[in-house]
Structure formats: structure tokens, C-alpha cells
Design a protein with these regions (language model features):
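Conserved beta-sheet core of the metallophosphoesterase superfamily
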Residues: 79-88, 174-226
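Generic low-complexity segments that are intrinsically disordered, proline-rich and/or Lys/Arg-biased
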Residues: 12, 119, 228, 239-242
């Protein structure tokens, strides 16, 4: 989406030129990709065409796939026009309008749920981005504090983690139930040994781009995620030129 939005013109009434505004921050996210494709323009065009064909979700009945968060309500509505999750250019264009259905779909499925940090606080991530929000779990059964729901590499300060969630905070959270199909997500930059988050939920993003692990799961006929079926390779940091 970051790449498609960078090249897709926004609607005339959206007060921006492109769906993904050409800010230094947005450019930084794509910088390495641009650099690696600089001498391969046709390959890059082919990749952009491929990105446009990729589904935003896969619902195979027994298991599901989504980048960041499964939202039954949004996905159900999306299926009405895009049953297989493959959206078109018009949908990307529509996402330039904040609060539009397309915008809410991309924000939720590709970015997940989040909460604003209390008391005007901000956090600076390992990548150098300063944020006023933090990523949250979308499966916690009965969370009471900020620490119960935080789900990101950068920990909350202890004095923030212990603060109670307000009713408004709780209303912004989702709950993916234990009775739902197995769900595999990425997005969250995990560390350590790959393992399920719950019997029906696993994250396969273990920070490969930051020299972590490139992770997969060997799926057979099981109905719950088997901790012994994660497979991975360690991503080696390249040696510096002599």
C-alpha cells in the first residue's frame, strides 16, 4: 500500500497530490526499496502490478491471513464488493479521504489497532519515528491497563504501562476470540523464538529486515497452531566492505 499510494494520484478534492503524501517520513519508509530497484525500472513496474493484485486478506475457512488485524465487520463489508480481497485502483484512490471506508480498511487491516499515549506523551521507535500512539493487541480478553494491551517492540514506560484503561480506550479495542479460525499476521516486528500468541493466533514477522528471523509456519490439517511447526532462517548481517 505504501508503494501503490506513493504513485497513485489522490482525488482532486482531497487536498493532496498523491494517496501517500510525498513527505520525508513516507519517503524514508520506501527509500531502500527505491534504491534497490533504481537500475531495474521494468521489474519495479511489474512489482507494482503484482502489489495491486495481492489480496488484503485470505479467508480459507480453517485459517485466515491478514497483515496486521482481522476486523470481521470491515472485512465482511469489503467482501460485498471484493469477495477475494483483491481491491482495484479506485479503492486505493478512495483511501486518500480520511475516514472513508477504503481509508478505514487500510488503516485497520494493514496497521492494526492503536491507542493514543496518555498525557500528551510521545515515544521514539528504534527506526527513529516519533509517535503519539502505540500498537495494541486485538485479542486480549479482559485488559485493564495499557500494559495489558501494548504489542510492539518498544516498551511503554512503567508509569504508563500501569495506568488503567478508560472506557473509551476499551471501546477502541477489538477481540479476536479463541473460538475463531487460526489467524496468521505479520506487521509486529517480533523477537526471540517463534511461537503462537494464542492457540489460534500467530505472528510470522520476526524482524527479518533488521537481521532477525525470516519465519514461516508448516500448515497441515491441524485446527490449532502447533508450536513445533514454525520454521525459520536467521538473516545474517552483511559484512562491511574491507
Amino acid at each position: 500500500y505504501n508503494a501503490l499510494g506513493w504513485y497513485t494520484e489522490a482525488p482532486p478534492d482531497s487536498e493532496r497530490r498523491h494517496v501517500r503524501e510525498h513527505t520525508p517520513r513516507h519517503e524514508r519508509v520506501l527509500q531502500q526499496t527505491f534504491r534497490q530497484f533504481a537500475d531495474h525500472p521494468q521489474d519495479w513496474r511489474d512489482f507494482l502490478d503484482w502489489f495491486q493484485q495481492m489480496p488484503l486478506f485470505i479467508d480459507a475457512g480453517r485459517f485466515r491471513l491478514v497483515h496486521a488485524c482481522w476486523d470481521d465487520s470491515l472485512i465482511g463489508a469489503l467482501k460485498a464488493d471484493y469477495p477475494d480481497g483483491r481491491i482495484d485502483r479506485d479503492f486505493v484512490v478512495a483511501s486518500a479521504v480520511p475516514g472513508s471506508f477504503a481509508n478505514r480498511v487500510f488503516e485497520r487491516l494493514l496497521r492494526g489497532t492503536d491507542l493514543r499515549l496518555p498525557q500528551g506523551l510521545t515515544l521514539t521507535s528504534e527506526e527513529g519515528f516519533t509517535r503519539a500512539y502505540f500498537r495494541t493487541k486485538f485479542w486480549e480478553d479482559d485488559p485493564q491497563t495499557y500494559g495489558d494491551v501494548v504489542f510492539q517492540p518498544d516498551a511503554l514506560p512503567d508509569n504508563v504501562a500501569s495506568l488503567p484503561l478508560t472506557p473509551t480506550d476499551k471501546g477502541r479495542l477489538l477481540q479476536y476470540g479463541l473460538d475463531e479460525p487460526m489467524l496468521f499476521v505479520g506487521h509486529y516486528w517480533r523477537r526471540g523464538r517463534p511461537a503462537p500468541l494464542r492457540p489460534n493466533l500467530a505472528c510470522l514477522d520476526y524482524s527479518a529486515v533488521m537481521y532477525g528471523k525470516l519465519v514461516a509456519y508448516r500448515l497441515d490439517d491441524e485446527l490449532q497452531i502447533d508450536p513445533n511447526k514454525f520454521v525459520w532462517v536467521e538473516v545474517e548481517r552483511p559484512e562491511a566492505p574491507q
